[in-house]
C-alpha cells in the first residue's frame, strides 16, 4: 500500500535545534539561586522635600565608623560578637505585644527587679539557639545587601499603605521594653505586598547605635546607617500572632534607614520628645496618634525584598522583609536623643541594639529597580528574579509551543500534498465504439 505522506509526528522523532536549546536550559534550572518562593543604595545625595535621601556610597557611614564585621561563608555560623563592643537587638516576641508569647521569650525585663525567668542577652548570640533552636536556622535576619548581587524583579510593585494617617485620638502606647522603644499600633493600618498578600500593622520600633557607632540592623555593601525603623505586620490569613510565627509570609516587616541631616524631622519629633518619660526599662505612656506613613520614606516604589526571620529569639523564619532604598533624615540632635535617652537591663544605657548580619545561604535579595546596574560604573549582569519553578514553567511552555507549531506545519504540508495529488488526476470517460453484428 502506498504511503500517504510523511508522518505528522516526524517533528517529535527528531529534536529541532530550538528544542535542543530549551532542553539545555532545563538542565540549567538547578543552578539558579533560591528566591522567595523557593524558601518556604546606591542612590545619590539629593534634595528631598520630605527630608529623605536615597542610599548611596557618598552618604553611607565611613568604614571606620562602622563596627568591623563580615558575613561568614555560606554554611558557617556567624562570628561571635564581643559584648563589650556592642549589644544586639531586633524583632523578638517581646517586641510583638501578644499574650500568646512564651514566658521565656519576653526579654530581660525585671532581671534585677525581682524577675526570674530565663532570657536571651545581646552579648551572647551564640547561646540563642539554646533559647530557641530557630536562631540557628539557615535563613536568618538581618543581612548585608550587596547591590551588585540583587535581582531586579519587575513584578515588585509600589507599596500601598491604608489607614496609616492616624488622628491624635485615640492615643497610642509608647513603651521602653528594655530592648527598644516600641509604639503599639491600633487596628486598621493595612498594606498589601501583592495579590492575596494583605497585612495589618502591629507595632513599630527602632534600632540605633551611639554617637561613635551607627546602629542599623541591615547594611548596604557592608555600610551601616545611624539607625533603622521597623514596622511589623501580621498576615490577615492569621488571626493570632502565634499562628503566624514560622509560617512562610506570616509576618512582614517594613524597614527604612535613618540618616543624619541638618534639619529636624517633625514626624519623628512626635516620638523622640517623649523618650525621657519612658527612660526606665518597663515604663510606658500614652501619646497622641500620629501619621505613621510620615515615619517612612516618601518613595515606596524602590525597595529590596527577601525572606528572613525575626532577629531576636525566637528567631522565627518565614518573615518577608521590605527594606526601602530611600533613607529618612533626622537631625544630629534627634539621633543623639535616640541613643542616650533610654535605659535597659542592669541599669545600662540602651544603645547598639542590633544583631550582626547573617549569611544569605543561597537566598536572593530582589529589588524593585535595577539596583545592581546602578551600583557599578561598569556594565553588570542584572540577575533575574525568576525562581526555579518560574523557569521550569517557561521552559515547558516554550517546548509545548514549539512542538505544537511544528505539528501544525506538518499537517499543513500533508494537506497540501494530498490536494496536489488530486489535482494531477484527470478523469476521461470511456469511448464507446460500435461493432457490427
UniProtKB/Swiss-Prot annotation:
The keyword Acetylation does not apply. Substrate binds at residues 311-312. The active site is at residue 179. It catalyses: hydrogencarbonate + H(+) = CO2 + H2O. Residues 50-79 have a biased composition (Acidic residues). Catalyzes the interconversion between carbon dioxide and water and the dissociated ions of carbonic acid (i.e. bicarbonate and hydrogen ions). This is Carbonic anhydrase 9. The gene is Ca9.
